[in-house]
Amino acid sequence: MFDQLFQESLIYLPDFQVNAAPSSLICELVESLCLIDGAMLRWPFHLARMQASCQALGWQDISEDLSKHWATASTQMPEDCRQGRTMARIVYGAEGIRSITFRSYSPRLVRSLRLVEANHVDYALKSTNRKVIMECFDQRNGCDDVLMVRDNLLTDTSIANIALWHEQHRRWYTPARPLLRGTHRAFL
């Protein structure tokens, strides 16, 4: 199963190419996957982003390590995570997979957004260090979340890319320069 998924992920690899970041500043990345009743959503897109991130940092290919760790972790998934919506969190670094954890997940309800300038934010790689994102989030002033603006362009919220539906054109629009190239954004 994984061999086919890894091959499919190569199709999406260009969607997640990033300029190389100084590898000394980034030592740990994370990938968060949604599972519905145990089935992974958009798995090839997540794999492509992980592979592109490793390439950008000059890290080893994690495909084999991920396959091995996932096989073990999925058998140890808590019973309450086998049904409904579950978040799988994969933490990895230059040497490979560090951990895979699971938790039940309910999307956060967002009814209000505050625009926050984020010209200083560089989050092209999904790092476990979200300090700069949380600094923006802390400026929400009573709103549920923030909508970050970089160079006068809408980018992302603190937890997701944005997608805007154009009723007349009957299609989704996403920012051309998001802070992080999201998997659902690439899927759209």
Which ranges hold each PLM region?
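Short, hydrophobic/π-rich interface segment
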Residues: W165-E167, W172-F187
